Structures are given as C-alpha cells and as structure tokens.
Amino acid sequence: MVDTIFALTNPGDKIIMFSPYFENYRAQAIMADCEPVFVPLVPPEFNFDANVLEDAFKQGAKAILICNPSNPSGKVFTYDELKLISELCIKYDAFAIMDEVYEHIVYDGHKHIYMNSLPGMWERTVSCSSLSKTYSVTGWRLGYALAPQNIMDRIKQYHDFNTVGAPSPLMEAAVVDLDMPDSYYQEFGAHYAHMKKLFTDGLKQIGIPFTDPQGAYFVLADIGPYMRKGESDVDFCLEMAEKVGVACVPGTSFFNENVNNIVRVHFAKKDETLYEALDRLS
C-alpha cells in the first residue's frame, strides 16, 4: 500500500479516504507528504453521501483509497457505489487504490466486486491484496499489487528500496496458496460465516448493540450504554482487558469524526475462544 501511494502521488497531493478507516492509511499518506481528505461512512449500513464525496474530488484529489470489504466497518461496497466512485475518478482524473485483503470474506447477500473490472478503471486502479487473511498466514507479511505495467514499474522501484523482497521460501509457499482450487475458497468463506454467526448471535443474546458486518471479520460494537460519564473509549478498552479479559480496539483509532462510543472486536478465533469471550461479556 505505501509503495503504491509513493508511486502515484507527489508531495502535497490529496488522497480521499472513507472514515472509519484502517489506521495505517493516514500514517502512510503522511509518510508520502500527502494530505488525507476524509468522507464519512454513515452507520449502520456505512453508506456515503455522493455530494460529499464529489466535493472531496473537487479539491483536486490525486487518488481515493478504499478498503473493500472494509476494515473496520465490515462494509462491502455495492456495484452502484463502485460505479459512482469510478465515474468520479474518471471525471476528476484520479486513481483508485484498492485494499482488497478481505476479498474472500463476504457474507450472504453481498458480493465483492473488483474496481478494476469497471469500464475505464483498469488503467487507473491499483488492486492491493495479501496472503495474510485468505490463507491464514498473517505473520508472513506477504502481499501483492495488480496494476497496469507503467504503474507497476514505479511501484516496484519504491518496493525495492523499502523492502528489497520477501523471503524466497515464503514466496514459494505463496505459489502453492495461490493455486488453491475453488473449493478452498468456498470452505474458507463458509468457515468465516460460521464464526460470524456464532459471535453475532451471542452479542444479540447478551444485548450488546453492534453493526452486522457484510464482510471481513470485525464487529463495531456500541459501548455507549456501558460507559461511565467522562470515560474515553481508550480507558474503557483498557478496563475491559484488565477486568473482563476481552480485548477490543477503541474506535477513535479508526474514525476521523468525534466518535467515542465505538469499539472494534474481531471474531477470527476458535469456537471455544468465542464462547469464552461471550461468556465473559455476559
């Protein structure tokens, strides 16, 4: 991702990001001396206002960065939403930087659509993905990008100086991963659907308000009813870890807006771990 930002932008350029956002994005933009321009996603569906988005493009944005499915909201962008974004990219001559690491974790009623498959978008889209989630090898830190040759040439230049390269044994193993049959992805998706149902059903029974994720493996829960007056989400999360034994991430890590009542919890765990977490939360 950071190599792509360096490859596509110049110092002072603006990059549009939806909020809530994966916290690394802001830091990566700042590293490239770029200015983030945030467009809010409105819960519970995390939709966006098309006029607000176009106003962001009108500021002369060089690119828009989208996590689809989204970390942390679990939003899966619809075809109509992506089509609108693509039309704005073309109209204002901007790139689309797509973080698609959760592309195979999408739940019933939703479908992951690749931005570079839309008319006029192949030449202005960089699709970034990772082996971490799809093949459960998060510790390997292996990722890849797909883009037109002229853009890839620049990305590779930055990647060479930033990273040099991944360990060759891991790259050989990655080839095996990428050659998995379709049945693997079907079983993989079904497994995550099972974990999601187990965890969200438990939250419903306990009565903790949350937004139902459309993809990825996160839940944004509303801690407002449980907070003391003047308590921050950071303090709440620290107390949760120390006294309840359940770790969550404060929402202020992800929102550009003044949000203090949301935490992110992830459910990519064994069944017994999820049951234990739900028991501690009840």
Give each language-model segment a name:
Residues 1-282:
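PLP-dependent class I/II
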